[in-house]
Amino acid sequence: MAKKNFKELFDPKESKWGGISLPMFLAALVVVAIMVYVPFGLDKEGNPGSFLRPNFLIMFSALAVFGLLFGEIGDRIPIWDEYVGGGTILVFFVAAVFGTYGLVPEKFMKAVDVFYNKQPVNFLEMFIPALIVGSVLTVDRKTLIKSISGYIPLIIVGVFGASVCGMAVGFIFGKTPQDVMMNYVLPIMGGGTGAGAIPMSEMWSSKTGRPASEWFAFAISILSIANVFAILCGALLKKLGEAKPSLTGNGELIIDNSKEAIKDKEVEIKPELTDTTAAFILTGVLFMVSHILGELWESLNIGFDLHRLVFLILLTMFLNIANVVPDRIKAGAKRMQTFFSKHTIWILMAAVGFTTDVKEIINAAAPSNILIALAIVLGAVGLIMLVARKMKFHPVEAAITAGLCMANRGGAGDVAVLGAADRMELMSFAQISSRIGGAMMLVLGSVMFSFFASEKYIITELILQLGYSLAVIHLNRKKLKIEWRNYGE
């Protein structure tokens, strides 16, 4: 495959802008600019209006043009493409800058928010289920069963590695293990914002009696920093896999010496459009059932939440293991997954970027916080890669799914990490990490807050701080003696 270059982008005879020629793409860019920036008439409140209408087709196309502009350029910047993540990462960061610093109108930002993760559009709720169903249905049944028995322990290994490395670096900056666990490890490894940091803040508030926002403000900042590290690590792991092929399964998570690896049903059966349509309908029906189960679970008031995507994963796994879905529909599901993962990723990355506040990252950018967050991410990745082969997983894919997809901002973070790593086919395992792994962290958070966020924690904190101070004095006793002598003189 020929390497992409800038020359082909500006050749009118080529069609390198997402399959569109340069003249057609420039025309589309002008139309989108008019739609977004040119004022027209008045809105319902009497304020200056525009041509923009926040419906699915308009927002899909506008974000596609934005994504193609910076995505195709990013894929051709030599160092950026090779080591940072290419067009996928450039689209994300440029969109984040545009959104944070008001380079697009507020009306457009609201429309993006609705398109991306708000009702009635919520493109993310179409994107992720399509990837989950397409991924899980095309996994060999025996391999799927084997993966479940080993994947949850792999997540636990990652959390352990993250905790140890985080506490080690935290000790250097005078932070106790409890502080690192509650304020760094839990929010970073907790399954994102909505399913992790928000419910954790409520748990913290119930134990301390203080406002939940007090814990959440710092948690969301540190999570934002870790999310950036996770995305960048995804791009670096992609590069590592290319440099060291023995470390990667090229998109396959499980090592299977019996050659019963993940099989692509599309190789065996050429799907028709009706098969893809059937797979899409099946995805919608399964999502409906998952939503019903999620609502019923919430009504039971068990004490911790299970996201509906957890039920979607479990239902799809059951259908695959039970072998009740015809191969032609599985082939259609694979085609559906390919469309979303390969041809709409820049659209979603643009939407994620526009709704990401760069200032959140800047606000928590103290050197100590940055280094602790980095240590947590690298600790999860490093320990997983060390044990992955013994647990029958490919190191690169294991580190991406069980490590980085635990250390990001949930569903959107999974998309960004897998996009940067070019491993979108691993979305089902990424969702296991974010949802089931996140639920496990909520349980851990509830236990930790019960012990260490109450009055008992204050006493423990004082004892540990005293121990830390004594350790520092011991390590620097000679220096202290000299300083004391000088002071006496």
Indicate where each model-derived feature is located.
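Membrane-embedded hairpin module used as a gating/binding unit in multi-pass transport
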Residues: P23-F40, F66, E214, S221-V325
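Transmembrane helix-loop junctions in multi-pass membrane proteins
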Residues: V32-L52, I73-P78, F98-V112, L137-I145, ...
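Entry/N-cap segments of selected transmembrane alpha helices
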Residues: F115-M126, S135-A168, I222-L223, A278-F280, ...
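Transmembrane helical segments that form the transport core of multi-pass membrane transport proteins
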Residues: L282-G379, L383-V387
